[in-house]
Amino acid sequence: MTIRLLCYVGFYFLGAGLMEADIYQTPRYLVIGTGKKITLECSQTMGHDKMYWYQQDPGMELHLIHYSYGVNSTEKGDLSSESTVSRIRTEHFPLTLESARPSHTSQYLCASSE
């Protein structure tokens, strides 16, 4: 069983549950085989220009991995990341990993602000 667990990468997301929210992440939970490409979607309905992706390992602090201050404007954050982002519309800020690995297992959080 331990060997099988090492063959999968888990992604956990902060979700709004049944509460009304203005920012959404999908999928909410994801378990995927190593080497697979994944895209984590983040969308917001508030028209905010600024959007952020954070990564948090269990028991550790949040690390900014990517941010955007508007359409076609993306920057890498504090944490060196193998992920990429795009921002072709104000309301969307997807995060993509080309090849998932066990070291990518973490909680990924999306945020936005004015």
Swiss-Prot record:
Annotated signal sequence range: 1-21
Phylogenetic placement of the source organism: Eukaryota, Metazoa, Chordata, Craniata, Vertebrata
Alphabetical UniProt keywords: Adaptive immunity, Cell membrane, Disulfide bond, Glycoprotein, Immunity, Immunoglobulin domain, Membrane, Receptor, Signal, T cell receptor
Pfam families: V-set (PF07686)
Domain of life: Eukaryota
UniProt keyword Zinc-finger present: no
PANTHER family per the UniProt record, alphabetical: T CELL RECEPTOR BETA CHAIN MC.7.G5-RELATED, T-CELL RECEPTOR BETA CHAIN
UniProt record, GO biological process: adaptive immune response; cell surface receptor signaling pathway
Predominant subcellular localization, coarse grouping: membrane
Subunit-structure text: Alpha-beta TR is a heterodimer composed of an alpha and beta chain; disulfide-linked. The alpha-beta TR is associated with the transmembrane signaling CD3 coreceptor proteins to form the TR-CD3 (TcR or TCR). The assembly of alpha-beta TR heterodimers with CD3 occurs in the endoplasmic reticulum where a single alpha-beta TR heterodimer associates with one CD3D-CD3E heterodimer, one CD3G-CD3E heterodimer and one CD247 homodimer forming a stable octameric structure. CD3D-CD3E and CD3G-CD3E heterodimers preferentially associate with TR alpha and TR beta chains, respectively.
Role according to the record: V region of the variable domain of T cell receptor (TR) beta chain that participates in the antigen recognition. Alpha-beta T cell receptors are antigen specific receptors which are essential to the immune response and are present on the cell surface of T lymphocytes. Recognize peptide-major histocompatibility (MH) (pMH) complexes that are displayed by antigen presenting cells (APC), a prerequisite for efficient T cell adaptive immunity against pathogens.
Protein name: T cell receptor beta variable 25-1
Organism: Homo sapiens
Entry's Gene Ontology cellular component terms: plasma membrane; T cell receptor complex
Domain Ig-like: residue ranges: 22-114
Annotated compartments: Cell membrane
Keyword Metal-binding found: no
InterPro entries: Ig-like_dom (IPR007110), Ig-like_dom_sf (IPR036179), Ig-like_fold (IPR013783), Ig_V-set (IPR013106), TCR_beta_variable (IPR050413)
Known glycosylation sites: 72
Disulfide bonds: 42-110
